[in-house]
Design a protein with these regions (language model features):
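Macromolecular interaction modules
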Residues: 1-210
């Protein structure tokens, strides 16, 4: 077994904007691209989401892609660098038509703390913390809940992720049963919130065998 069975500690986060007439082709290409990435060392899981509501309603990204990583070191392995050089990059139909925002993020906190192996939930709520004190406060609150909670919320995972050059992001993976709880915690934050639906969710073969 080449990968650890520990909980992933990093996320490669990609927000994507592109014209609607390219969505079907883009999705088909992405499915294959995700599977290519999942054979690389340190890549544990690939997910892609479609935007449904909220956030930047004037110009929201249509898709989010997130790779769960052992650590950010996975983005600097010889295998990853070589794959990036040899993969050929974007297909011709996307060149000049796509805009991507990339963030290489560490996981600052998670609830539950041992959320791996993951639940395959269909919904994602994402909100940005525009105040460092909010991020620290939420992180401390999550630590307290992790220590004192008798039972986890079913099909629910909350993570705070952050990179060096932008605001922290809170990822809330859930199914319909947790929607009311999420409404409460996101409304209290006063932050920018968006909702997403999962359209791709696969793990690396090593993660599935662990």
């Amino acid at each position: 077994m080449t990968e650890s069975i520990t909980t992933p500690n990093a996320v490669l986060y990609l927000a994507t904007w592109l014209p609607s007439h390219l969505h079907v082709q883009f999705s088909a290409w992405c499915d294959d691209h995700h599977r290519e990435q999942l054979v690389l060392p340190g890549f544990r899981r690939a997910r892609r989401f479609e935007w449904t509501a909220g956030g930047r309603d004037d110009d929201p990204p249509q898709y989010l892609t997130m790779y769960d990583l052992d650590s950010l070191a996975a983005l600097h392995t010889e295998a990853y660098v070589e794959h990036s050089k040899s993969s050929g990059g974007l297909p011709d139909f996307l060149r000049g038509h796509i805009r991507v925002q990339r963030r290489d993020c560490n996981v600052l906190a998670a609830l539950p703390s041992s959320w791996w192996p993951p639940a395959h939930t269909s919904l994602l709520n994402l909100f940005q913390l525009n105040d460092d004190e909010l991020a620290v406060g939420l992180q401390e609150h999550i630590s307290t809940l992790t220590e004192t909670s008798a039972a986890p919320i079913p099909d629910f995972t909350l993570r705070i992720i952050d990179s060096d050059n932008d605001e922290p992001i809170v990822l809330v993976d859930h199914d319909d049963a947790a929607t009311a709880f999420i409404d409460t915690i996101t409304a209290a934050s006063g932050s920018l919130r968006s909702s997403w639906r999962c359209v791709f969710d696969e793990q690396s073969s090593a993660s599935e065998q662990a």
